[in-house]
Amino acid sequence: INTGINDTSYYWNELSRCVNLYCDLKKICPELDSLNIGGGLPIKTALSFDYDYEYMIEEIVSQIKTICTRENVKEPHIFTEFGSYTVGEASAVLYSVLQQKRQNDRELWNMIDSSFMTTLPDTWAMNQQFIILAVNNWDREYERVFLGGLTCDSHDYYNSEANLNAVFLPKITCDTPCEEGQEGDVQYIGLFNTGAYQEAVGGYGGVQHCLTPAPKHIIITKDEDGELVTKLFAKEQSYKSMLKILGY
């Protein structure tokens, strides 16, 4: 059901049609015993996200059982494909702000040290929204900004207008690129719940758009005492690695 699982009349009507079709097929083929309702269970893409998972799952199961009982058909084994829900919260992407530039009287751009098109391709392809938070400098005043990537492509930016969600981040105090330890040092930002599709679509280990290097990959787990443990999975891609792939 291509709308995703939402508490709307359209979704419930489509689910009802799906289950009724299963019942019709079950009467023709008694060996049929399973129903795949697909994916579409949403994940948190904004801090304001509010979704009653327990209610929705219980209601889906209840409606399937009700229709099958009415049609005198044994209820099926239910299969789902909740990919985004399963893996979405497993990843985050961290960027640093290289520099800030004023485009005009209204647009203040924070330029990140990577590319949205290569690391989070859904932001470019379908204006996907993700949770954006400042990693440091929470004690500073904040300002509305736009986020741009490093590539030469005019589409390499986070489209906050399409998401109707302005981006507010701590004020940048450096006129030139900041360095660690400098007054108003490097501003880091994180985009969270990025575990679904992004790396699979963007690719891993190859050559990216505009030769943007693949970022460093770090795995964060907890030990038996509940303490966070980090492990380097892959270093940031080097120019030598990219040139070797290209045959130089």
Model regions: which residues?
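Charged (often Lys/Glu-rich) extended helix/loop segments that serve as interaction or gating elements
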Residues: 59, 65, 69, 73-248
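Active-site loop/helix belt of alpha/beta enzymes
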Residues: 1-106
